[in-house]
UniProtKB/Swiss-Prot annotation:
Pfam families: PI-PLC-X. This is PI-PLC X domain-containing protein 1. GO terms for molecular function: phosphoric diester hydrolase activity. InterPro entries: PI-PLC_domain (IPR051057), PLC-like_Pdiesterase_TIM-brl (IPR017946), PLCXD1/2/3 (IPR042158), PLipase_C_PInositol-sp_X_dom (IPR000909). Its main location: cytoplasm.
């Protein structure tokens, strides 16, 4: 895939900005006791969608997501996860003052905290959950090469509180990874989800529309990547497919995504991940680089690809598009703007 000419990058960005202005409208209803947010405020973009889109199932809409949502709270003292390679653990023991900072640079995929991501318009949260060794019995955390200090129960509560302030917004929570989780811990986590979100939860079934969710006062779909647990809780949905290219180079990643599109989209909700993936060899050979710098270098090609996508029900349509550093280059706005392509002329 060839790099974009500067003039072409400008045209792509202009198209996305123009479309974004047309897909949102300020509805006549009010949210709670306050008027709906003004146009362009992405904290309430779902409630501001054109009424024509209220009856479109969520898996046919274009929805922005964040990859490895919780990595913003990692720091240099975060512990390396037990699932990481033996070489990384060895380096962590021998030269911890070097290993910690280097690993952190490649573990952090987001700079906005979870509330800021929701305010920015992100509606798919990628929650990699783990039980860290030597942690207390039920203190579940998040993981991406390193363990977070943030606890799962606190984060779910923060999300629920945000939703109470935005009663017509809908979030999709993908609970994944489950490093160190036992059957008892899965039941504990499922219980936390049910207790914290309560009637906000949309039970597993046919993918709903926004109008249906609003009528039922439901705001949360929880995808859970453990089949045994899903079978025990009606409130949990099966794992949402995530197209992961596992590629360091942007052009390789985008070719993978195009190949997946060519094979036909899944029937329900699914994610196209536009996240670059490093490996340990690459990290060791590029000690002064970082995932953020590598991601930002890839933005021109990523932007072109995103703006070319089409939501809907056709085999090559996209649904959720998730990326790293979602605050960069108007990523969220561009994904939301794709919904304009669903509007009748």
């Amino acid at each position: 895939m060839q790099g974009l000419e500067p003039s072409r990058v400008g045209r792509v960005g202009e198209v996305c900005r123009s479309v974004h202005k047309n897909v949102l409208t300020v509805p006549e209803h009010t949210v709670g006791t306050e008027a709906a947010a003004p146009m362009g405020d992405q904290a309430d973009w779902m409630s501001q969608l054109c009424p024509q889109l209220w009856d479109v199932p969520l898996h046919h809409l274009s929805i922005p997501g964040s990859h490895d949502t919780m990595t913003y709270c990692l720091n240099r003292k975060s512990r390396i996860s037990r699932a990481s390679s033996w070489l990384l653990h060895l380096l962590g023991r021998v030269v911890p003052f070097i290993t910690g900072p280097v690993v952190m640079k490649w573990s952090v995929t987001q700079t906005l905290d979870v509330t800021q991501q929701l305010d920015a318009g992100v509606r798919y949260l990628d929650l990699r959950i783990a039980h860290a060794p030597e942690g207390s019995t039920r203190n579940l955390c998040f993981v991406h090469m390193m363990y977070t200090k943030a606890l799962v129960e606190d984060t779910l509560t923060e999300i629920a509180e945000w939703l109470q302030s935005h009663p017509r917004e809908v979030v999709i929570l993908a609970c994944r990874n489950f490093e160190g989780m036992t059957c008892e811990l899965h039941d504990y986590l499922a219980g936390c989800i049910v207790n914290i979100f309560g009637d906000m939860l949309c039970p597993s079934g046919e993918v709903p529309t926004l109008r249906q969710l609003w009528a039922r006062e439901q705001q949360v779909i929880v995808s859970y990547e453990d089949e045994a647990t899903v079978s025990r809780y009606d409130q949990l949905w099966p794992a949402i497919p995530y197209w992961w290219g596992n590629a360091v180079k942007t052009d390789v990643l985008l070719r993978f995504l195009e190949t997946m599109k060519g094979q036909g989209r899944p029937d329900g909700l699914f994610v196209a991940g536009i996240n670059i993936t490093e490996n340990l060899c690459y990290i060791l050979l590029h000690p002064v680089d970082s995932l953020e710098e590598m991601t930002r270098r890839s933005l021109p090609l990523m932007t072109e690809w995103v703006c070319a996508q089409q939501p809907g029900q056709s085999p090559q349509c996209t649904n959720i598009i998730a990326g790293d550093f979602v605050d960069a280059d108007g990523f969220v706005s561009k994904v939301i703007s794709l919904n304009c392509k669903l509007l009748s002329p």
